[in-house]
Amino acid sequence: MAWRIEFDEASKKDLSKLDSQIARRITAFLRDRLAVSNDPRSLGEALKGSELGEFWKYRVGDYRIIACIEDGALRVLVVRIGNRKEVYRS
């Protein structure tokens, strides 16, 4: 089962600000591991909190990918990408 990976505007901006080597590593993770996974939840961890329950985080080195998984559409919507120290602040 192939999942479709999509980016919202904020995550596109986040990705463009990253060093090119880190950006390639993140896109490779999304393409080679997450998109082809039978269950994208098995690779990540649910964010805690009442407002954050629908979001999942994925760890790629010191960087985190915050995404929303839509089972009905087989889609993973990436909403934020950033360093683990800063990605949760906004």
Show the residue positions of the predicted features.
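Secondary-structure boundary motif
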Residues: K17-S20, V36
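A short, surface-exposed loop/turn module that caps and links secondary-structure elements
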Residues: D32-K57
